[in-house]
């Protein structure tokens, strides 16, 4: 029965692993729901800030803030948002593939690229493949605040202010649904204009601003970009938890299939051992 005992030991070991992956799946599902709530809660605030920016920009039409001014693009900055931990399927590898494709496309058109990295996996990746890294941050946890990564954002905003970069983008995983997450590259600076902005350009209310519209615009535009980065980080965390939940569910299901296979092998081994014992008893009786 040595074979049967070994199989039973393997079944016990796999069953313990299955309990762990099942628990991790449930934890990831809970974290994903909480992150989705934070993601939804921040969007109305961001939309309202953008509306205010449009109103203020119209009120101070003679003043063109650098964040809203187009200029010749020679050097591009990109903020890459990744995870700190693994066990989330191909989430990071898909993001890295899209990031490298985007960077190479810019470089083929004669543009230099500066990079800021959020997340430990991104830091490890760019240490391996190289790149001009201006700043990085990791260990943000599952509930980050804007203050946690404001230093990295400020580095890129200062680079834009000083003319070191001429546009700023962010790449992160977009949450489509629980089963689908995809890499997404978004332009942050100069502030892109939507079709709706162009249509409503001549229709606006007149407001009196205190302090001056210029001072407000200088402050609120920076806050808006920080909020855009925050939304990208939170959405990436939601994607991480969704991918982790799916990966752990797959691991749990695979463990269940393995247990069934080993259980069948155990039953066969036990049956063979019993048959052998019966044959020995019958053989011994016949000898008597």
Curated annotation (Swiss-Prot):
Cited Pfam families: ATP-synt (PF00231)
Source organism: Legionella pneumophila (strain Paris)
Superkingdom, taxonomy of origin: Bacteria
Name of the protein in its database record: ATP synthase gamma chain
Record has Iron-sulfur as a keyword: no
Record CDD domains: F1-ATPase_gamma
Subcellular location: Cell inner membrane
Assembly: F-type ATPases have 2 components, CF(1) - the catalytic core - and CF(0) - the membrane proton channel. CF(1) has five subunits: alpha(3), beta(3), gamma(1), delta(1), epsilon(1). CF(0) has three main subunits: a, b and c.
Gene name in the database record: atpG
HAMAP family, per the entry: ATP_synth_gamma_bact (MF_00815)
Any single Gene Ontology cellular-component annotation: proton-transporting ATP synthase complex
Family: Belongs to the ATPase gamma chain family.
Function of the protein: Produces ATP from ADP in the presence of a proton gradient across the membrane. The gamma chain is believed to be important in regulating ATPase activity and the flow of protons through the CF(0) complex.
Membrane topology field: Peripheral membrane protein
Gene Ontology molecular function, alphabetical: ATP binding; proton-transporting ATP synthase activity, rotational mechanism
NCBIfam families with a match to the protein in the record: ATPsyn_F1gamma, PRK05621.1-1
GO BP term, pick one: proton motive force-driven plasma membrane ATP synthesis
UniProt keyword list: ATP synthesis, Cell inner membrane, Cell membrane, CF(1), Hydrogen ion transport, Ion transport, Membrane, Transport
